[in-house]
């Protein structure tokens, strides 16, 4: 598969699916959490994707690419933290928490791989297809 946009990256697809699942689950959380936990976890989970898209747009410059990937990774860690709060507040059951936490860890691992070896993703590297099909 040829990578034409950030949307083609497996890490983007996984992060997007995670954000959408968090959105669906959080719709049933108490109204008093609307502007705190619910808002925070939705924003953080969505920011993983938006920062990844920004990183992709800035891949002409390695430092900018890495900076935005780092932001994406940070938002993923924040999402994981909010999942812990949701569990401890009784808004998530342990099986949903475990499953979503595993998804966060997988996204983090994929982002970590990109951070360790950013060169295949940079614009000056023509052969994106063969080197990025697993992410």
PLM feature spans:
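Short, C-terminally biased terminal segments at protein or domain edges
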Residues: 1-135
